C-alpha cells in the first residue's frame, strides 16, 4: 500500500518580487542648497549704538573686541553681516538670542 500524504506539497506563497531598477535616463540631482550651512545675518538698524552691538557680539559669540568691532562696522557700513553659521537649530537659537538683545537678525542658507 502506498503512503498517501494528507498535506499539499510546499508551495511558496510569496510570489517573487520583480527586480526594479531605475531607467538609465533617470538622473538623481542633489539639491545643493540642502548641503549649505545656515547663517545668522545681523541687519543695520537706527536704534542700537555701535558699542552696544560690539558688546552683544562679544557676549553671545565669544568674539574678541577686534573681531566684534569688525563685524559691527560691516553691519554699519554694508547694512548687514554674517555673525554665525551652523546647523539650522544652532542658527535659530542665535537669532533668538540676538532678538532678545534687541538686534535685527535673520537666518538663511549660506550663499557662498
UniProtKB/Swiss-Prot annotation:
It comes from the Bacteria. GO terms for biological process: protein catabolic process; proteolysis. Disulfide bonds: none annotated. InterPro entries: ClpS, ClpS_core, Ribosomal_bL12_C/ClpS-like. Coiled coil: none annotated. It holds the Pfam family ClpS. Belongs to the ClpS family. Binds to the N-terminal domain of the chaperone ClpA. Involved in the modulation of the specificity of the ClpAP-mediated ATP-dependent protein degradation. This is ATP-dependent Clp protease adapter protein ClpS. It comes from Rhodococcus opacus (strain B4). The gene is clpS.
Amino acid at each position: 500500500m502506498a503512503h498517501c500524504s494528507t498535506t499539499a506539497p510546499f508551495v511558496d506563497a510569496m510570489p517573487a518580487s520583480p527586480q526594479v531598477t531605475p531607467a538609465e535616463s533617470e538622473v538623481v540631482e542633489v539639491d545643493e542648497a540642502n548641503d549649505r550651512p545656515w547663517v545668522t545675518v545681523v541687519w543695520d538698524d537706527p536704534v542700537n549704538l555701535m558699542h552696544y552691538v560690539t558688546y552683544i557680539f562679544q557676549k553671545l559669540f565669544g568674539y574678541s573686541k577686534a573681531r566684534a568691532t569688525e563685524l559691527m562696522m560691516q553691519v554699519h557700513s554694508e547694512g548687514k553681516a554674517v555673525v554665525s553659521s551652523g546647523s539650522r537649530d544652532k542658527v535659530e537659537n542665535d537669532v533668538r538670542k540676538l532678538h532678545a538683545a534687541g538686534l535685527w537678525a535673520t537666518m538663511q542658507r549660506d550663499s557662498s
